[in-house]
Amino acid sequence: LMDLFLTQNYQITFLSTATISENSFDLNSKNIQFQNIVLNDNSFDDLIKKLSPEIVIFDRFSTEEQFGWRVSEQVPNAVKILDTEDLHFLRNAREKAFKQNKNLENSDLVNDVFKREIASILRCDLSLIISEFEMNMLKNQFKIDEKILFYLPIFAEIKKSEIPFSERRNFISIGNFLHEP
């Protein structure tokens, strides 16, 4: 997503409550500025006003909950975009149904995460949706105005392997298995 904005000659400032570590992506390599921010702190108001962005992208609905109102107050003309990646309320409902060994039902979708995420979508000027299923569900089932939704499937470059699938060996996955299905 950042590459998309860079190709359009946007100057990007990446704001995060997380600190940069040796494992962080090198934003400087792409000429992207980094600023550390603090939750529930007026210093964010001063920073966002100083930066005066035309566009603000929230990487998930909980980020919009924390900072969206401050953006609206300090830079009211900024376009607020929610990058949903995937809908957390849907993921949450699927996880619960899976753990209960049952099929997902419409009633499973309406939960606290649903209310928060839909509210965030409605507060933003635009929400990026990566799944056609999610796009249709938001438009048809939950009657979210199509004008505030933008279907943007994952656009990572896929490199073809020179080794046929049947001949591939020795795959290792490293992680902590904390991300639910």
Predicted regions and their residues:
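A short helix->loop->beta-strand "cap" motif at the edges of active sites that frequently abuts
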Residues: 75-80, 146-147
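Helix N-cap/beta->alpha junction signal
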Residues: 60, 84-86, 131-133
